[in-house]
C-alpha cells in the first residue's frame, strides 16, 4: 500500500505540468502541516450558552466529550459571551495506530529516514478526527443526532495557513493562471484537489470543442443569404401556409417566414453532421487523456496503489478496537423495491414534461386571445416562456430529487460511506438527468409529429390544438430551449453560488460586530471560523453534479447548439475561481477526503458520452432537415441520377416538401380570415393530396433516417472505441515508475532477508550474464 502524503517527490517526471494545473515537485508548504507539538485544534464543536444551563443537555455534552477522551482525544472549553467552543485534538497515539494499521509511515520521506519524526499532515488529522466524531457513540448517537437535538450547534475544521491559497488561487485576477493542485491537495485533501484537476483539464479541453462549434456556427452565416432553400422561402409570395395552431386564424405567406428560415440554417446545415462526429471523438479523447492525467497525479501523490476499503477499515478500528467487519451483502428484494421507486420518480419527471407540453398549448391560446403578442411572435413567446417554466421546475425538482435519492440510499443500507456516496450519485444523477433533458427530448423527437393534418388536428382534451414546428423544422425550438436553460443555469447559478455565500457571510459579520470583540487571539480565530458559511457532505458533491449536467448540455443535443462548448468554456473559467474563493474565503474548511480518482463520476461521464452519440444521431436523423435535403438532392431534385444541371441541386425543395390541403376540407367551424378566395394551402408534412394519408415519400424518408441513425451510431461508437484503445489509460512513464517501485521493494526485502539470522550464510552471487540468458 502507498503512503498517505508525499513530502519529497523527484522532479523531472513526465507530465509534471498540466493545463490549468500546477504540480509542485518540492515539499508541501509548511503552513499546511501541523506537528504533534503544536497546540492547534484539529476540530471544533460549538454549543450555545443556553445548553450549559440545561442540565440534561450539558450532561449529554459531557458524556460525548468524555467518550472522546477515552478514545485518545484532548478537548478544551473556550467561552465567549454567547457561544461555547470545544477545541478537539487527537493524541499522537491515534496517529501512531493509524500508521501501524496501514503499515506505512506518512510518505516517502519517513521511509527513507525512519528515525526522523515526521509531522502529521493537517488533512490526515482532520480526516481521522472527523471520522471518529461522526461515528456512533456507546449510546447509539452520532454527532449529527446531537446537533439536530441542539446539544451542539455546529462543528467544523479550522482554516489555518490558507494565506498562500488566497494569493495564488482564490482571486479573480488569477482566472487564466494555472491552479496550484499540490497546495490544494495539502490543504483540502485529495478529493477536492482531484475535482479541481479534473475541472481544469475539462476547461482546457473545451477550447478545441468551442473553436469547432464557433466555426460551424460562423459557417452557417455563409448560408444566411446564399442558401437555395432560404431564397425559395423568401421569394415564395404566392404560397399560402395553413394556420398552424389556435393562435393563428389567417393564412400566412411563405415569404413571411424568411428571417426565421435563415436563422434556422445557422444551426441546421451540412456541418452539423461533422460537428456531431467530432464531439463524439472529443468526448472520448477527453476522458482517455484525463485517465492518463489522473494516473500521473496520483502517482505523484504516492496514492497509485491506495485502497479505500483498507483506509475505511483502519479508521473504524481507530474509532473502536472491537469493530467487526461488515461483509458485502445484496438483497434482491431491496434492489427490486428501489428499482420500482426509481421508475416511479422517472415517470414523474416524464409527467412534468407532459405538463410543460400542456403549458405551451395553453400559453399559445392565451397569448393570442389576450393580444399580448403579434401573431408571428406567439410561437417564439411560447418557446421562451416554456423554457423559463422548465428552468423553475428544474430548481424545484432538484430539491425533491435529492431528498428521494437520500431516502432510497437509506433504505438500501450501504456498507460504507463511500459505497453510500456512490449509490447516491447514481440515483441523484439519473433523476436530475430526466428533470433537465425530458423537455428537450419532447421538442427534438415528439413536437410536431403527432399533430395530424389541418383537416383532422389532434387536440388536447378535444379543445386545444397541439403546437407544431416551424416550417423550417424544430431545430430552432430545440436551440432556443437549450440556450435559455443552459444560459440561465450558468449565469443565475453562478451568481447565486457566489452572492448567496457572500451576502450570508457579510450578514454574519455585521451581527458579530454588535458584540464586544475578544482580546484572546485563540478565541478570535475560533470566532472568525465560526462566522464563515457552514459546509456539509454535499458541498463538493453539488459542484460535481453541476459540472456533470453542464457536460451533458455540452455533448447531448450539441448538434442543435454548437455554441454550447463555448458557453461552457467561459462559464468554467469563472467557476474555477468562484469555487476557490468560496472554499477559501467564504466557507468553513471542507473536511479533507482521501481519493485516487473522481469515483462514480467517471462512469457518469462515460454514460453521457454514449448517450450523446445516440441523441445527436437522432437529432440529425429526425429533427434536422439534413436527411430530407440529401434525399431530395440525389433522388427527386434536378441532380438526380447524376445529372449536372445549371441550377442548384436543391431547387424546388420547398415546393416538394410541403403537402397540399384543400380549404373545403376544414372541419373547424371558426371562420379563417381571408379564406374567401383561397382553395388550397400548404403545410409541413409528407401526405397525399387526395385522402391526406402518409405518402410513399414519408416511408422512404423514414427508412433512410433509420439507416442513417444506425450507421451514424455505429461509426461514432467505433471511433470512440478505437480512440479508447489507441490512447492507453496509464502512461508508460507511470507504469515504469510503479514497476520500479515494486522491484525496489522486492530488492529491499531480499536485502533485509539476507541480514536476518538463519538465512543460511552467504550464497554465491549469480553471474549477471547468466541471469540475462535465462530471460
What do these predicted ranges mean?
Residues 2-775:
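Intrinsically disordered cytosolic tails
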Amino acid at each position: 500500500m502507498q503512503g498517505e502524503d508525499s513530502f519529497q517527490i523527484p522532479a523531472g517526471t513526465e507530465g509534471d505540468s498540466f493545463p490549468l494545473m500546477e504540480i509542485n515537485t518540492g515539499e508541501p508548504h509548511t503552513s499546511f502541516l501541523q506537528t504533534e507539538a503544536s497546540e492547534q485544534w484539529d476540530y471544533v464543536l460549538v454549543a450555545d450558552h443556553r445548553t450549559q444551563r440545561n442540565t440534561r443537555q450539558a450532561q449529554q455534552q459531557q458524556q460525548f466529550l468524555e467518550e472522546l477522551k477515552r478514545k485518545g482525544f484532548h478537548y478544551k472549553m473556550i467561552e465567549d459571551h454567547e457561544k461555547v467552543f470545544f477545541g478537539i485534538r487527537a493524541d499522537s497515539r491515534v496517529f501512531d495506530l493509524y500508521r501501524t494499521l496501514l503499515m506505512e509511515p506518512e510518505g516517502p520521506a519517513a521511509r527513507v529516514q525512519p528515525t526522523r519524526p515526521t509531522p502529521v499532515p493537517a488533512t490526515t488529522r482532520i480526516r481521522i478526527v472527523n471520522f471518529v466524531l461522526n461515528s456512533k457513540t456507546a449510546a447509539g448517537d452520532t454527532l449529527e443526532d446531537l446537533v439536530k437535538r441542539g446539544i451542539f450547534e455546529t462543528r467544523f475544521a479550522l482554516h489555518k495557513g490558507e494565506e498562500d491559497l488566497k494569493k495564488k488561487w482564490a482571486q479573480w485576477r488569477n482566472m487564466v493562471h494555472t491552479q496550484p493542485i499540490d497546495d490544494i491537495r495539502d490543504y483540502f485533501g485529495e478529493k477536492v484537489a482531484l475535482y479541481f484537476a479534473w475541472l481544469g483539464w475539462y476547461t482546457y479541453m473545451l477550447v478545441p470543442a468551442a473553436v469547432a462549434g464557433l466555426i460551424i456556427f460562423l459557417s452557417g452565416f455563409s448560408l444566411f443569404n446564399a442558401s437555395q432553400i432560404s431564397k425559395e422561402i423568401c421569394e415564395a409570395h404566392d404560397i399560402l401556409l395553413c394556420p398552424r395552431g389556435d393562435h393563428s386564424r389567417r393564412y400566412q405567406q411563405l415569404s413571411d417566414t424568411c428571417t426565421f428560415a435563415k436563422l434556422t440554417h445557422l444551426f441546421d446545415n451540412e456541418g452539423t453532421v461533422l460537428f456531431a462526429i467530432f464531439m463524439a471523438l472529443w468526448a472520448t479523447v477527453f476522458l482517455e487523456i484525463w485517465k492518463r492525467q489522473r494516473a500521473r497525479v496520483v502517482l505523484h501523490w504516492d496514492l497509485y496503489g491506495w485502497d479505500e476499503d483498507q483506509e475505511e477499515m483502519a479508521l473504524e478500528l481507530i474509532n473502536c478496537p472491537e469493530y467487526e467487519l461488515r461483509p458485502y451483502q445484496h438483497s434482491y428484494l431491496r434492489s427490486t423495491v428501489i428499482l420500482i421507486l426509481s421508475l416511479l420518480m422517472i415517470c414523474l419527471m416524464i409527467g412534468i414534461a407532459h405538463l410543460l407540453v400542456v403549458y405551451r398549448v395553453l400559453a399559445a391560446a392565451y397569448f393570442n386571445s389576450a393580444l399580448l403578442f403579434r401573431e408571428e411572435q406567439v410561437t417564439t413567446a411560447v418557446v421562451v416562456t416554456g423554457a423559463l417554466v422548465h428552468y423553475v421546475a428544474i430548481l424545484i425538482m432538484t430539491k425533491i430529487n435529492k431528498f428521494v435519492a437520500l431516502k432510497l440510499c437509506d433504505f438500501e443500507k450501504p456498507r460504507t460511506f463511500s459505497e453510500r456516496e456512490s449509490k447516491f450519485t447514481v440515483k441523484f444523477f439519473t433523476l436530475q438527468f430526466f428533470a433537465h433533458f425530458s423537455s428537450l427530448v419532447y421538442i427534438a423527437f415528439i413536437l410536431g409529429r403527432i399533430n395530424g393534418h389541418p383537416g383532422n388536428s389532434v387536440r388536447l382534451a378535444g379543445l386545444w390544438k397541439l403546437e407544431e414546428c416551424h416550417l423550417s423544422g424544430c431545430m430552432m425550438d430545440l436551440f432556443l430551449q437549450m440556450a435559455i436553460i443552459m444560459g440561465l443555469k450558468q449565469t443565475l447559478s453562478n451568481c447565486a453560488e457566489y452572492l448567496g455565500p457572500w451576502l450570508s457571510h457579510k450578514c454574519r459579520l455585521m451581527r458579530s460586530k454588535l458584540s464586544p470583540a475578544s482580546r484572546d487571539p485563540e478565541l478570535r480565530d475560533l470566532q472568525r471560523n465560526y462566522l464563515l458559511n457552514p459546509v456539509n457532505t454535499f458541498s463538493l458533491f453539488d459542484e460535481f453534479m453541476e459540472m456533470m449536467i453542464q457536460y451533458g448540455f455540452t455533448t447531448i443535443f450539441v448538434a442543435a447548439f454548437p455554441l454550447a462548448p463555448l458557453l461552457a468554456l467561459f462559464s468554467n473559467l469563472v467557476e474555477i475561481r468562484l469555487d476557490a474563493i468560496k472554499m477559501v474565503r467564504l466557507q468553513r474548511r471542507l473536511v479533507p477526503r482521501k481519493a485516487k480518482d473522481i469515483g462514480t463520476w467517471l462512469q457518469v461521464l462515460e454514460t453521457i458520452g454514449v448517450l450523446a452519440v445516440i441523441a445527436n444521431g437522432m437529432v440529425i436523423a429526425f429533427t434536422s432537415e439534413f436527411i430530407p435535403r440529401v434525399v431530395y438532392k440525389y433522388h427527386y431534385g434536378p441532380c438526380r441520377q447524376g445529372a449536372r444541371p445549371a441550377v442548384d441541386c436543391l431547387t424546388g425543395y420547398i415546393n416538394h416538401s410541403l403537402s397540399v390541403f384543400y380549404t373545403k376540407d376544414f372541419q373547424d367551424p371558426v371562420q379563417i380570415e381571408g379564406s374567401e378566395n383561397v382553395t388550397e394551402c400548404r403545410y409541413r408534412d409528407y401526405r397525399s393530396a387526395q385522402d391526406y394519408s402518409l405518402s410513399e415519400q414519408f416511408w422512404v424518408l423514414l427508412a433512410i433516417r433509420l439507416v442513417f441513425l444506425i450507421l451514424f451510431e455505429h461509426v461514432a461508437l467505433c471511433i470512440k472505441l478505437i480512440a479508447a484503445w489507441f490512447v492507453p489509460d496509464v502512461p508508460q512513464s507511470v507504469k515504469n515508475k510503479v514497476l520500479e517501485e515494486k522491484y525496489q521493494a522486492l530488492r529491499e526485502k531480499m536485502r533485509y532477508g539476507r541480514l536476518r539470522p538463519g538465512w543460511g550464510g552467504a550464497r554465491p552471487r549469480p553471474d549477471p550474464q547468466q541471469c540475462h540468458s535465462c530471460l
